[in-house]
Amino acid sequence: MAFCGPRTAARLSHSTRALHYTHRSFASPRTLNEVVIASAARTPIGSFQGTLSSLPATKLGSIAIKAAVERAGIPADEVKEVYMGNVLQAGQGQAPSRQATLGAGLAISTPTTTINKVCASGMKSVMLAAQSLMCGHQQVMVAGGMESMSNVPYCMSRGATPYGGVKLEDIIVKDGLTDVYNKFHMGNCAENTAKKLSISREEQDGFAITSYTRSKAAWDSGLIANEIAPVTIAQKGKPDIIVQEDEEYKRVDFSKFPKLKTVFQKDNGTVTAANSSTLNDGAAALVLMTAEAANRLNVTPLARIVAFADAAVDPIDFPIAPAYAIPKLLSEAGLKKEDIAMWEINEAFSVVVLANIKMLDIDPARVNVNGGAVSLGHPIGMSGARIVGHMAHALRKGQFGIAGICNGGGGASAVLIEKL
């Protein structure tokens, strides 16, 4: 065993004091910073193999990020970090969020991280950025989500090619829409929830029709247009195409709703193509900053982030997971459900929203008042960021809004904001 003399001990004591000082100099602030949403922008949502299908998710992400930064009215180099949700990353190349960030014209020195929490990816990006800002690690960040389901490839397992041909798997289904624990489509989980909570097909069809009518009314009134970052698509030898409106909500024939066969459960099933969300392309981005940074940069924020929470349940019960995350929010904020003016619960399936309305006992008239993913579309990496951004635009001053979204594996994320 080694012993040290007085001089060595003195040097060690001095070094210890220096290390202690260094540690303290990098400590988090004693009080958390207030975080505000400076801007929120999104691309239109394109139908599967539709108007936006020529653009990869990273390009759509660049368009959303660039628009959000411009609308915040700040120099691009003020953004110090970017988080972007993206689920179906196969074939996109390294670091999709980095591609989207540099494509938006942000500084080469901007660190980026791609977030995958399945359908909650875009919302989790907002939550993680808010945490970084609250702790004082950064002052200005961009967070959002992006997906181009039209460009997702097929895959083949590595190894010897078997006799009789090869088997290709659809990455949309394999990595995005399959419950890996029960080895079936997420729609089977939706059927399970419908059965448990006695939610009929008629209720789900009725909800879907309401989603379409609300989306159309919101677009007709001009309410959604201020969220949109138009997408320009170059054409060879022809004028460019400018896409500035969601594509999916206009592609509906209500007369077919009661005639459609159920998709996931043939006997006594309730979930159909009409009362489920669709495969889509799009991106959304929000500029988040501390209240101090907003003052310094003369930014008038849209809203402030009050609280956020995650929850997890049995994977088969993923549709009801928001009903476990949302009470955490209300408790943390000291609010009651009656204090919430607007609810955005992502419409992965109509039964998801109906189940959460039932479990939370909330007013359906305040839920998804301008439509949702069943009618607008569900680019899975984008949707969580889209509903937070939509609330930041749609709420009135002083109102509170909650956005919740379920995700595969039995998870959910939720965010509470206040309009400023």
UniProtKB/Swiss-Prot annotation:
It holds the Pfam family Thiolase_N. Residues 1-33 form a transit peptide. CoA binds at residues 212, 251-253, 256, 277. GO terms for biological process: fatty acid beta-oxidation. Pathway: Lipid metabolism; fatty acid beta-oxidation. Keywords: Acyltransferase, Fatty acid metabolism, Lipid metabolism, Metal-binding, Mitochondrion, Potassium, Transferase, Transit peptide. Transmembrane segments: none annotated. It catalyses: 2 acetyl-CoA = acetoacetyl-CoA + CoA; propanoyl-CoA + acetyl-CoA = 2-methyl-3-oxobutanoyl-CoA + CoA. This is Acetyl-CoA acetyltransferase B, mitochondrial. It comes from Xenopus laevis. The lineage of its organism: Eukaryota, Metazoa, Chordata, Craniata, Vertebrata.
